[in-house]
């Protein structure tokens, strides 16, 4: 009898409730190369042993329910059940444990992030035996990742499309994010692109509101792109947000963007949903559009240390679902992000093979095989004085996005773009000459500002602006 059809009917059925750990806690289990592995931060309720809590997570996110059922005998639970195979204490935290769970690959539909998350982070997060639960990391085996298309194009194809190499790309989110007419919005796009930026961007909540309908915005932004390209000789783009109330409307907007000949569209992948995002990513690959991803709503899921899901999991899911850019924090700006933890998931977005490194929050070695990489976008409260640190932290394969740091320039939008482009070129040149950006960054910016009045004005405006808050997202003590 094949494992798929093997049953346990001959064993007999015994009704009642039994501890999860009797079936789902298997410390002797040797994980398979095809298993999806998960690391959960578990906070059990008082009186619940960690082994029972870890087993409950494995059970409720795979084949288990609260009581034994007749139909258990109609399948092979040993083939399909999740297994909690290891538990470790979190040093420095009261009543917290890392529970490692292995899931057989047959539990998941091929090419569906939606189905994967419905199982792994579904009802189990409301389980009463747990005070809190957080998914820290996933190991996606190549046998599963190869069922996904992944990013529409990836880093190298994007650089070839833009004909831009050897430096980070520069962007700007148009502000105010809401309230501008389409024509005034397009004017701001033109001024920023003409000044030297590679991209401008719709904010995440710009969709199709009464003050600016999407079709009008697309038309004026396309006009701005073509005008700026003609004047600068560079390929330009604007992230046209195609996010909509239905998948059909979203694809309609992407089709219109393609007909206009613009290079890139945008999607809010968490509020829009993984099914919609994957559909849009497939359309973008088939039609030559780059896809920029915004992570609006992520902090609702990932901000708390003991409950929810770490952003590195959302980043892996996005790489599988599809996107060419994704916002990833700045380390130095106004948004949450500790350096090593941020670089941990940045590597998971960009690199082919990432080694386990608990000091950076990476619980498992991840092999993406041939899946294209995603460009991280640093955005949020950054300005010209941050340019050396951003260039040093994120490297060439990144987008550095200055919204207020462009549009807040005292001389206007185009001079703000000029200031950022001059600062970036100065940092890249200094790095290529062997200078230490971390140590000499301020001197590099000051030297460049002597030859650029636009940069000098920006330096004066933002010389004392800092965001000095202690990040929540830090590695555990034992992982250092």
Curated annotation (Swiss-Prot):
Pfam families xrefs: RuBisCO_large, RuBisCO_large_N
EC number: 4.1.1.39
Reactions it catalyzes: 2 (2R)-3-phosphoglycerate + 2 H(+) = D-ribulose 1,5-bisphosphate + CO2 + H2O; D-ribulose 1,5-bisphosphate + O2 = 2-phosphoglycolate + (2R)-3-phosphoglycerate + 2 H(+)
One Gene Ontology term, aspect cellular component: chloroplast
GO biological process: photorespiration; reductive pentose-phosphate cycle
Residue ranges of coiled coil: none
Cofactor note: Binds 1 Mg(2+) ion per subunit.
A GO MF label: ribulose-bisphosphate carboxylase activity
Cofactor(s) the record lists: Mg(2+)
Main function: RuBisCO catalyzes two reactions: the carboxylation of D-ribulose 1,5-bisphosphate, the primary event in carbon dioxide fixation, as well as the oxidative fragmentation of the pentose substrate in the photorespiration process. Both reactions occur simultaneously and in competition at the same active site.
Protein family (similarity comment): Belongs to the RuBisCO large chain family. Type I subfamily.
UniProt name for this protein: Ribulose bisphosphate carboxylase large chain
């Amino acid at each position: 009898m094949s494992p798929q059809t093997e049953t346990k009917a001959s064993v007999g059925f015994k009704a009642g409730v039994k501890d999860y750990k009797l079936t789902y806690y298997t410390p002797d289990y040797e994980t398979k190369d095809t298993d999806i592995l998960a690391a959960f931060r578990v906070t059990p309720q008082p009186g619940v042993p960690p082994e029972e809590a870890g087993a409950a997570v494995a059970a409720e996110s795979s084949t288990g329910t609260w009581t034994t059922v007749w139909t258990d005998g109609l399948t092979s639970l040993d083939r399909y059940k999740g297994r909690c195979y290891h538990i470790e204490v979190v040093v420095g935290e009261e009543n917290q444990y890392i529970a490692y769970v292995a899931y057989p690959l047959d539990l998941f539909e091929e090419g569906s992030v939606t189905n994967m998350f419905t199982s792994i982070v579904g009802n189990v997060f409301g389980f009463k035996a747990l005070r809190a639960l957080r998914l820290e990391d996933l190991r996606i085996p190549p046998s599963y990742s190869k069922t996904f298309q992944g990013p529409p194009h990836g880093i190298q194809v994007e650089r070839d499309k833009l004909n831009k190499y050897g430096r980070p790309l520069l962007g700007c989110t148009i502000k105010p994010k809401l309230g501008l007419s389409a024509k005034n919005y397009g004017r701001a796009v033109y001024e920023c692109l003409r000044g030297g930026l590679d991209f401008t961007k719709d904010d995440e909540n710009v969709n199709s509101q009464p003050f600016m309908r999407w079709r009008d915005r697309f038309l004026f932004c396309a006009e701005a792109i073509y005008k700026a390209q003609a004047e600068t000789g560079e390929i330009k783009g604007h992230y046209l947000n195609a996010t909509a109330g239905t998948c059909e409307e979203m694809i309609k907007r992407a089709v219109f963007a393609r007909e206009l000949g613009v290079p890139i569209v945008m999607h809010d992948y968490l509020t829009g949903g993984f099914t919609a995002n994957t559909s849009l990513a497939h359309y973008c690959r088939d039609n030559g559009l780059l896809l920029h991803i915004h992570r609006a709503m992520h902090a609702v899921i990932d901000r708390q240390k003991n409950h929810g899901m770490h952003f590195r999991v959302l980043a892996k899911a996005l790489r599988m679902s599809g996107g060419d850019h994704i916002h990833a924090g700045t380390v130095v700006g106004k948004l949450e992000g500790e350096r090593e933890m941020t670089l941990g998931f940045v590597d998971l977005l960009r690199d082919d093979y990432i080694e386990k490194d608990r000091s950076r929050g990476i619980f498992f070695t991840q092999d993406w095989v041939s899946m294209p990489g995603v460009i991280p976008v640093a955005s949020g409260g950054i300005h010209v004085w941050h340019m050396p640190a951003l260039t040093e932290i994120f490297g060439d394969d990144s987008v550095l996005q200055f919204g207020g740091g462009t549009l807040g320039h005292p001389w206007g939008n185009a001079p703000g773009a000029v200031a950022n482009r001059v600062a970036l070129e100065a940092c890249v040149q200094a790095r290529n000459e062997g200078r230490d950006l971390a140590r000499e960054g301020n001197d590099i910016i000051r030297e460049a500002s002597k030859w650029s009045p636009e940069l000098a004005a920006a330096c004066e405006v933002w010389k004392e602006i800092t965001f000095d808050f202690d990040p929540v997202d830090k590695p555990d003590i034992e992982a250092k």
